[in-house]
Amino acid sequence: MRAVFASFLFALLCACSGAPEQSPAPESPSPSAGDRVSAFLQTYQAQFFRGLPNAEQAATLAPHFSPRLNALFRDALAGQQAYKAKFPSDKPPMIDGDIFSSLFEGASSGSVDAVDASAETASVRVKYVYNDPETGKAIQTWPDRFLLVRGESGWLIDDIEYLGGWDFSPRGKLSSALSETAALGD
């Protein structure tokens, strides 16, 4: 009887040891760099504001941005308010116009056109379209580039490079314009 019991126990142990280990459920992947930019575009276009975002608007957009860019927005808003206090009859910088694209009037729509990502940074080219408000016909198209960094929660927008090639379109990067406005508060 002991031999039967020992054989049974041996067979049971062999069967159990061959069973594959259950691995934990895979974590849901963080959004891609392109997904982050698409989500930002949806959030921003639903807000429809111009110039620097106020505190409430900035809070809505903040989850899309890196800590560095969020700090630049806070500093630029403080610089803008300091400028208003010093020069109440002057129009402060970044008070109107679309600061998230090359076109002052803003885009009617934007979509991710190309993504180039490495382990820690990504570049996402967005194709923007501006439609004539009366006819709805596209009258301007252009690319701009979003620069992202990988944060703890995934990809975060760290800057925007203006690529519009017409007269009076902004040049350079959003971070530079924010820094210049922030310096007005010093």
Where are the regions that the model predicts?
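Positively charged n-region of N-terminal signal peptides that target proteins for export
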Residues: 1-4
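C-terminal motif of bacterial Sec signal peptides marking the signal peptidase cleavage site
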Residues: 13-15
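Bacterial signal peptide processing site
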Residues: 17-20
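Core segments of small alpha/beta cavity-forming domains
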Residues: 26-94
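Extracytoplasmic/periplasmic, Sec-exported soluble proteins
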Residues: 28-33, 50-53, 61, 116, ...
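Surface-exposed, charged secondary-structure patches
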Residues: 66-136
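Low-complexity, intrinsically disordered terminal/linker segments enriched in charged
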Residues: 121-125, 129-144, 151, 156-186
